[in-house]
C-alpha cells in the first residue's frame, strides 16, 4: 500500500526559493515538508562561482551555497525528503501530490520547482546527448581537459560556461547568433581578456546547424552563418547555454500559466506569490522570467512562506 503523508505546508523544490521558504515556514512553526525533486539544490549546484551573494565577500561555489541553505533549513527542523513528484491534484482539499516514493497531501503548497536547461532541438543534439553534448560545464567539463570545445549562447550562462571551460579545454569557441552579447559587463570584460589570451575564440553571427560525430561521440560542429554560408569546427564537446525553461509541465491544466511560467498575483497588497488556486503559492524561476537571480528567488521564497502563513492563519481563524 502506498504511504500517504499529510503536512500543513509542502514546499516543492530545493533551490534558493525552496530553502528560503523552508526557513521562514519552519520559524513560523508550520513544520514544512520540503521535497527536493530530481536535482537537489537546483541550478546553483551546476554553478562554479557565485560572486554576487551579499555577505560572501570572496565568493563561493554554487554547491557550497546550496549546502549552507540546506543546513539552515534543517536547523529549524524542516523535514527534507528526496523524492520526485510526477502528478498533482488541486481539484480538492487537501491537495494531493504523487511521488515516486510516496503520496503527499497538504493544506498549502509552495511551488519552487525552478527551471531546466533549454536545448536547440536539433536531432544531432539529442543523438549525442551525454556523448559530447552537455548543458552543464561544471558537471562535464573535466572530460575535455586539453581538448577543443564549443559553447552555444550569448547570455550570462554562455559566457560563464566559456570562462569556466577556458581553464580546462585547449580552446573554447563561443558561438553566438548575434554581434553582441547580453551578458553582464563584468563577464564581458573577463571574456575579452580570455579572448586576448587566445583561450576563447568568438564565432559571432552564427548558429549551430548540426553536431557532428561518430560512434565514439562528438567530433565537430557545423555552423550556419547569418549570411547563409557554412563553417565546420573540430571540437570534442558542445555545451548548450541558451537559457532555461520553467519546470511547470506538471501543473498544466490546474494552475494558470503564461509562456510556461506560473502566474502569480503580484502587487504590493500582500499575497503577491499566490497562484490561481487558493493556498498554492509560487516562488523563484518557476514564476520569474525577468530577474532569475539566486537572491531574487530567495526573496520570493520568503514572500511565499509569509503568504502561506497568513493563509493558514486565516483557515484556522475561520474554523474557530
UniProtKB/Swiss-Prot annotation:
Intrachain disulfide bonds: 136-139
EC number per UniProt: 4.3.1.9
The residues that hold FAD are 36-43, 285-294
One of the record's GO cellular component terms: cytoplasm
Kindly state which reaction or reactions the protein catalyses. 2-amino-2-deoxy-D-gluconate = 2-dehydro-3-deoxy-D-gluconate + NH4(+)
- One Gene Ontology molecular-function label: glucosaminate ammonia-lyase activity
PROSITE patterns the record matches:
PYRIDINE_REDOX_2
**GO BP annotation list:** removal of superoxide radicals
Give the enzyme's main class according to its UniProt record, as a single word. Answer: lyase
Further facts: The active site is a redox-active disulfide bond.
The entry's function note states: Catalyzes the conversion of 2-amino-2-deoxy-D-gluconate (GlcNA) to 2-keto-3-deoxy-D-gluconic acid (KDGA) and ammonia.
Q: What is this protein called?
A: Glucosaminate ammonia-lyase
Q: Which organism is it from?
A: Pseudomonas fluorescens
Amino acid at each position: 500500500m502506498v504511504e500517504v503523508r499529510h503536512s500543513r505546508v509542502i514546499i516543492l523544490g530545493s533551490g534558493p526559493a525552496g530553502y528560503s521558504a523552508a526557513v521562514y515556514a519552519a520559524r513560523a512553526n508550520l513544520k514544512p515538508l520540503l521535497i527536493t525533486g530530481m536535482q537537489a539544490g537546483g541550478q546553483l549546484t551546476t554553478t562554479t562561482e557565485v560572486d554576487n551573494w551579499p555577505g560572501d565577500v570572496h565568493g563561493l561555489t554554487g554547491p557550497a551555497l546550496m549546502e549552507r541553505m540546506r543546513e539552515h533549513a534543517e536547523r529549524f527542523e524542516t523535514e527534507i525528503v528526496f523524492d520526485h513528484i510526477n502528478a498533482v491534484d488541486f481539484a480538492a482539499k487537501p491537495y494531493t501530490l504523487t511521488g515516486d516514493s510516496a503520496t503527499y497531501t497538504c493544506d498549502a503548497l509552495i511551488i519552487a520547482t525552478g527551471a531546466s536547461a533549454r536545448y536547440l532541438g536539433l536531432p544531432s543534439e539529442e543523438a549525442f546527448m551525454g556523448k559530447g553534448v552537455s548543458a552543464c560545464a561544471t558537471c562535464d567539463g573535466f572530460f575535455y581537459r586539453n581538448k577543443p570545445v564549443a559553447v552555444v549562447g550569448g547570455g550570462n550562462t554562455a559566457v560563464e560556461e566559456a570562462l569556466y571551460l577556458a581553464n580546462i579545454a585547449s580552446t573554447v569557441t563561443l558561438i553566438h547568433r548575434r554581434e553582441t552579447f547580453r551578458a553582464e559587463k563584468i563577464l564581458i570584460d573577463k571574456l575579452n581578456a580570455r579572448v586576448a589570451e587566445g583561450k576563447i575564440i568568438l564565432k559571432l553571427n552564427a548558429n549551430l546547424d548540426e553536431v557532428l560525430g561518430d560512434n565514439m561521440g562528438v567530433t565537430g560542429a557545423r555552423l550556419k552563418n547569418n549570411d547563409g554560408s557554412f563553417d565546420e569546427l573540430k571540437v570534442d564537446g558542445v555545451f548548450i547555454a541558451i537559457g532555461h525553461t520553467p519546470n511547470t509541465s506538471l501543473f498544466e491544466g490546474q494552475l494558470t500559466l503564461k509562456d510556461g511560467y506560473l502566474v502569480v498575483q503580484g502587487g504590493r497588497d500582500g499575497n503577491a506569490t499566490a497562484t490561481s488556486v487558493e493556498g498554492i503559492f509560487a516562488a523563484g524561476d518557476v514564476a520569474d522570467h525577468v530577474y532569475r537571480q539566486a537572491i531574487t528567488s530567495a526573496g520570493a521564497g520568503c514572500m511565499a512562506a509569509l503568504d502561506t502563513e497568513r493563509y493558514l492563519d486565516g483557515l484556522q481563524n475561520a474554523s474557530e
